[in-house]
Amino acid sequence: MKSSTQAVLEHTAIPKHIAVIMDGNGRWAKKRFLPRIMGHKRGLDALENMVKHCAKLGVQYLTVFAFSTENWRRPEDEVSFLMGLFLQALQKQVRRLHENNMRLKILGSRERFNRQILKGIEEAEALTANNTGLTLSIAADYGGRWDILQAANKLIAEGVSEITEDTLAKYLMLGDAPEPDLFIRTGGETRISNFLLWQMAYAELYFTDILWPDFDGKALDDAVASFQKRERRFGRTSEQLPIEQQRN
């Protein structure tokens, strides 16, 4: 009997870039009468598994929303724990990424991070900068509107007189990375919550009730299988699509 991963690989192309809002850590913990921080710890485990499975499938870019600009409003003890977990991941998990030829990038403002976290970010990005495997981008203290504004301000500061879509895109946090093909949100909510607003213009959206700590390889396979069944026309008619895409 074939595994779910093998079944996915026998269909059409795997999405080159997957973006994820990892929602549901707190609710996962609450259902088990555990403190919220335990949900975040299990969420980190789920991310590790997601990275491994994406690499196995052949996904080239994985971008996850870890901490938004709005998340600073959460209880102080929870924010403190999240920052500590972030630093722990930078210090320990980055070695595994590097050993597997994966690159790590951190997207977002760095103004509110302490020196220890900033140092961890710089060292992690430098260590993996030349790796050529999967690129894992973690959005931390990030917001889609903020991203567009910071890009516009950089263009103004550099005196760019004419701004095109391509020009603006290069100044966004994702830089030269391709736009996401597939967006996944766990936890049952059906909105994009200020995440990659510009870059997700043509992404296929996939929402699931599964809470993030429970999102495993099979759940990812199901999301990719759903993506592969969709007809991505980008404004064209079905008849204008390549023959290979029409067959799928």
UniProtKB/Swiss-Prot annotation:
Q: Which UniProt keywords apply?
A: Magnesium, Metal-binding, Transferase
Family annotation (SUPFAM superfamilies): Undecaprenyl diphosphate synthase
The cofactor note from the UniProt entry for this protein is: Binds 2 magnesium ions per subunit.
- GO CC annotations, alphabetized: cytosol
Q: Which residues bind substrate?
A: 24-28, 36, 40, 68-70, 72, 74, 185, 191-193
- HAMAP family the UniProt entry points to: ISPT
In Swiss-Prot or TrEMBL terms, this protein is called Isoprenyl transferase
Native organism? Neisseria meningitidis serogroup A / serotype 4A (strain DSM 15465 / Z2491)
What is the gene name?
uppS
